[in-house]
């Protein structure tokens, strides 16, 4: 299956990634991606960018090397109430927002607490994607999360790095989540979570799961850039962007 976008990527600005914005955009162009999202870690992650970094996205062009660039953040959920580590006046102006649970930012809790954190963050109108919800460090009630995602029109991310270098043990959880998304008709978005340009657009391990359960193409956002851009525009974002 051909995928044309990857919106979960990091640059050197995140502190533990290895390539620049231009290097990422150039690589995305070379492999034929049409949309690239830069979603740096929120400020509570050690060595993440200062909040001014996110304010200043406005200086960046919408296209680099012919690739449509989305300027966003992987915000950190900082408590079980679903609060984030970026103020609303910044979050509301980002092109795309992924909300994730990370151990340096919120202590893993019980299934009920972890689930509450995700359910609560989905009430935030500026959150677009739940990042790597299959992380075994944060066990959740996946069915509740998927049902809430459908109710709130939130995308569920399946994260390729969860099967390679991070969050070891995610395969069973992610498989269950994909099955539930298929059952309930919830859109998923594939993310590379690249911290170096060479993994951008690589969803090889995710593809094995998708093939094993015959996931409908219609529920995979990455197959058509218009699916994503239309979705974001429906939430009041990307006001400057004209969809061809």
Curated annotation (Swiss-Prot):
InterPro entries xref list: Phosphatase_YcdX_put (IPR023710), PHP_phosphatase (IPR050243), Pol/His_phosphatase_N (IPR003141), Pol/histidinol_Pase-like (IPR016195)
UniProt keyword annotation of Zinc present: yes
SMART domains for the chain: POLIIIAc
The organism's taxonomic lineage, starting at the top: Bacteria, Bacillati, Bacillota, Clostridia, Eubacteriales
HAMAP family per record: YcdX_phosphat (MF_01561)
UniProt EC number: 3.1.3.-
Binding site for Zn(2+) 3: 74, 102, 132
Cofactor binding note of this UniProt entry: Binds 3 Zn(2+) ions per subunit.
Family statement: Belongs to the PHP family.
Residues where Zn(2+) 2 binds: 16, 41, 195
Enzyme class: hydrolase
A GO cellular component annotation in the UniProt record: cytosol
The protein's name: Probable phosphatase NT01CX_1282
Cofactor(s) this protein requires: Zn(2+)
UniProt binding sites for Zn(2+) 1: 8, 10, 74, 193
One Gene Ontology molecular-function label: phosphatase activity
Annotated keywords: Hydrolase, Metal-binding, Zinc
């Amino acid at each position: 299956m051909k995928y044309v976008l990857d919106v979960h990527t990091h640059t050197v600005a995140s502190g533990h990634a290895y390539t620049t914005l231009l290097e990422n955009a150039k690589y995305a162009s070379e492999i034929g991606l049409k949309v690239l999202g830069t979603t740096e870690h929120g400020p509570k992650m050690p060595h993440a960018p200062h909040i001014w970094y996110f304010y200043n996205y406005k200086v960046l062009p919408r296209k680099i090397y012919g690739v449509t660039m989305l300027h966003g953040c992987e915000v950190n959920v900082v408590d079980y109430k679903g609060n984030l580590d970026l103020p609303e006046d910044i979050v509301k102006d980002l092109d795309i927002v992924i909300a994730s649970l990370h151990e340096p930012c919120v202590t893993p809790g019980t299934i009920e607490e972890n689930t509450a954190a995700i359910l609560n963050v989905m009430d935030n109108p500026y959150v677009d994607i739940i990042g790597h919800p299959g992380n075994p460090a944060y066990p959740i009630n996946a069915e509740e999360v998927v049902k809430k995602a459908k109710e709130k029109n939130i995308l569920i991310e399946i994260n390729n790095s969860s099967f390679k270098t991070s969050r070891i043990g995610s395969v069973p959880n992610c498989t269950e989540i994909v099955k539930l998304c298929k059952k309930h008709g919830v859109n998923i978005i594939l993310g590379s979570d690249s911290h170096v340009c060479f993994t951008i657009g690589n969803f090889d391990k995710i593809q094995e799961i998708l093939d094993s359960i015959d996931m409908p193409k219609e529920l995979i956002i990455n197959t058509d850039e218009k699916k994503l851009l239309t979705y974001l525009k429906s939430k009041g974002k990307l006001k400057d962007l004209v969809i061809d």
